[in-house]
Amino acid sequence: MRCLGIESSCDETALAIVDDGRLVDAVMSTQAELHALFGGVVPELASREHYRLIGRMFDSLMLRCGLGVQDIDVISVARGPGLLGSLLVGVGFAKGLALAGGQRLVGVNHLHAHLLAAGLEHRLVFPALGVLVSGGHTHLYRIDSPRNFTLVGRTLDDAAGEAFDKVAKMLNLPYPGGRFIDVLGHMADPDDSMFPRPYTDNDNLDFSFSGLKTAVSTWLKAHGGTALAAPPAESELQAMLQNNVLPSGMPADMPLVCASFNAAVADTLYIKARRALQRLGGRGQIRSVVVAGGVAANSRVRTSMQRLAAEEGLHLHLPSPALCTDNGAMIAYTGWLLASEGLHHSLELETMPRGRVIPDDYIYDAH
């Protein structure tokens, strides 16, 4: 079964083809440089860029794969959560293809797809604890199958990825700033007493990162001159990412701030994920840990999750960094998994922007 996946939930336009669970090819275009001018994603600009790019990217993907529309069996698309205008572009395009070619249409939960994407590299083992850490969400799930997700913990305010971007902005680093904080964090040893492990002195499974963001802001104000005076030039950014070369004029304390912030986020995720495993019955009830989302590309977060899985004696599904950020492969793979179970949607499929509950409204077809 060959499945086309379409992702347009935020500021990446991405398409991919999965054939019987294996990735055939993928294309992706990011709008990060465009939105960096505004310090964050501008929804209207994002949807216009998706509309401008999606058709030509589809043509390019099909040409690269040597396929026609008639060679696709299933069309899957991210239906939410995300930005409404962006989602409408992807869902509208998917519906048009399905209507013209007669393929089955599968609407995919973007968050679930992040967690299932690890299955492209290694067979997933269920039941699993899902740890989703992205720019808009920090969620803990019990996952029993590709269709059955139970939310057990979530952020009450800022998501971890949002905290990374806001701290990067405080330091005058470019948007999105998580990768720069990660690289700078390797240039110093963290001070575990510098920043709190927020919202861990309780017995629940929810997160709150607003206090950590405030703690960083307070520290920076008390230690003036820690942030860059101006954003680095592109050449300096590339030197930092590729060769660990500090930008000119970087304050001496900046790597320490990044290392300590990285450690605070990673420790918080470790504490809550370990607590979730205990609540869900531990090794006797949970067989693996799945970590996903853009922040899962952070090296310290990856190390903390590796430690957790090793301590608990569980399989760890940690996708490669390319599969952590928004991509078409995760949508295609999830669509293939669901279609393999006989699940699909009608052409009345609704988009579900952030804030709306995505219903389990699949149509079951035994054939």
UniProtKB/Swiss-Prot annotation:
Top class in the EC scheme: transferase
EC number: 2.3.1.234
Identification of the protein by name: tRNA N6-adenosine threonylcarbamoyltransferase
Residues reported to bind substrate: 132-136, 165, 178, 182, 298
Parts forming coiled coils: none
SUPFAM superfamilies associated with the record: Actin-like ATPase domain
Bridged cysteine pairs (disulfide): none
Required cofactor names: Fe(2+)
Subcellular location: Cytoplasm
Residues making up the signal peptide according to the UniProt record: none
Residues binding Fe cation, per UniProt: 110, 114, 326
Cofactor, how bound (note): Binds 1 Fe(2+) ion per subunit.
Role summary: Required for the formation of a threonylcarbamoyl group on adenosine at position 37 (t(6)A37) in tRNAs that read codons beginning with adenine. Is involved in the transfer of the threonylcarbamoyl moiety of threonylcarbamoyl-AMP (TC-AMP) to the N6 group of A37, together with TsaE and TsaB. TsaD likely plays a direct catalytic role in this reaction.
Keyword Cytoplasm: yes
One GO process term, biological-process aspect: tRNA threonylcarbamoyladenosine modification
CDD domains named in the record: ASKHA_NBD_TsaD_bac
